[in-house]
Amino acid sequence: GLIVQPDGSLLITPKIGGESIHRVRVFEVGASTDRTYLLRLLVGAYVAGFTAIHLEAKGRLPPFVRQLVREFTQMAIGQEVVGETDSSIVIKDLLNPAEMPFENTIKRMHLLARGMQQDAMAAIRGHDAALARDVVARDTEVDRLHWLVARQDNLIVIDAALSRRMGIPVNQAAYYFQVSRIVERIADHATRVAHNATALSDREAGAAMLDVMDEASALALEIFSESM
């Protein structure tokens, strides 16, 4: 069928119904499964847009798998355990993508990244190690939002009906993803500043050097905000 996109272009698709596309990813796990590798598989399946993730073991699930799943559901927005047995776990996406517009997510990421950079600089000037550690912790929230944008971008590529419901053409979704990736990198740099603030918390920096750093940071944040 042909679908008229919000930008006036035509999309040719074999599926024009309003129902969502359900995709399931199955992972076999065991005692020898690497923890870090499994977490990457879960995050990858989430970002790729799978609506359900099944973890299956030949015997009982190792305890570390259940713990890792709990950590993953706290990291990934909308993911919840909906089924669990001794040998399997089912994780399902319960978030309606249309309720999380790209623009709102990007704005939230901008505010977080901006606040992180401001607080990281304040931590350096004030020798505040606790504030610096808080900045580092906030980077996880920016990552969560970036993963959500990446997931929704992939979902729109896969599901034309979702593109219509959200009023976002495929090329615009890709643009939001690129912006999200840049903002996530800005937050990463703020995290590096915070790590340095922790290392320098017991050292005294010259007033002139601090003024130069504050001026550079303020200019960078001004450009950042204007670009948004």
What would you call each of these model-derived segments?
Residues 1-228:
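Cytosolic, long alpha-helical scaffolding segments
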